[in-house]
Amino acid sequence: MIYSTTETIPGREIAEIKGVVTGNVVQSKHIGRDLMAGLKSIVGGEIRGYTEMMTEARNIAIQRMVEDAANLGADAVVGIRFTTSSIVDGSSEILAFGTAVKLL
């Protein structure tokens, strides 16, 4: 499966639009990461535990979006975007979405 943030795939032509596809994950904080985050917020700097957690969550969201596209018979997903939001205190949602297409 090809997926891209661009609206087209270079060297390929879109034959059919299959529809909007999504993949999301809600990730909660880990108490150990929370303690380190509290310390980092005092002294400043990147909170690596959260960065790694969000990277993993984004990858899961992409995988779920690609599975959604495959279920529609798509060859690719174009125009991929990401959003994040807080669901409840201590958890965040990452949503990946794009347009599933069939290529020539």
UniProtKB/Swiss-Prot annotation:
InterPro entries membership: UPF0145_dom_sf (IPR035439), UPF0145_YbjQ-like (IPR002765)
Pfam families: YbjQ_1 (PF01906)
Superkingdom as given in the UniProt entry: Bacteria
Family of the protein in this entry: Belongs to the UPF0145 family.
HAMAP family recorded: UPF0145
Name of the protein described by the UniProt record: UPF0145 protein VIBHAR_02090
Organism: Vibrio campbellii (strain ATCC BAA-1116)
